[in-house]
Amino acid sequence: YSAASNKKDTRVFRFYCELKEEVNPDVLQEALNQTIEIFPTFLMVLRKGLFWHYLEPCNLRPIVKEEYKDPCSRLYMKDKKTLLFEVTYYKKRINFEVFHVLTDGTGATEFLKELVKNYLYLIHKVNGLEPVSLLPEDMTVQDQEVDSFLKYYSKDQKRPKKRKLHAFQIRKRKKDGNHLHVHESVASVQAVLKRSRELG
């Protein structure tokens, strides 16, 4: 991923959670500090070796910031020691952006769930909210480091052929520059489930 990332394709993806109230940045920072204790494998920098890139543990600490740049902007800067993820906020939204070399969608989902859980507990514990665990009690750092692709993927495994359905393509004239265009939609879960069941 690192060798292929550039201004046009940063290999960064974003997950976010929209709350019902404005985000308190100080509490979010405290929640992030707690979350990183559970996910220490996220405290990595990408280094360039003689033949390949590698991840190296670091002492950098993530700092919560108000959203200040375009979504999915570059996180990996060649020859610069920076974390490969970022937590920002905007009004009621908590954003988690991560360079794909660090984790996949599942890891990002677990990190964001833990972050939001910690945030909500810190904000609402005065109202009697009890702490809950979202992760298995016996999960270790080694469990977090497992590369599921290597564990489960096999090029020899036969897969049944399926008819390929093409996703809807938004057709528009390309604009100049390296700007990411964000499309956001809101849909009823019931309506989407009903339609997906109709289509099989």
Give the ranges of each region predicted by the language model.
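Non-catalytic N-terminal regions of enzymes
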Residues: Y1-D147, V189, L193-R195
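Flexible, P/S/T/G-rich "lid" or insertion loops adjacent to the active sites of thioester-utilizing
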Residues: F149-L199
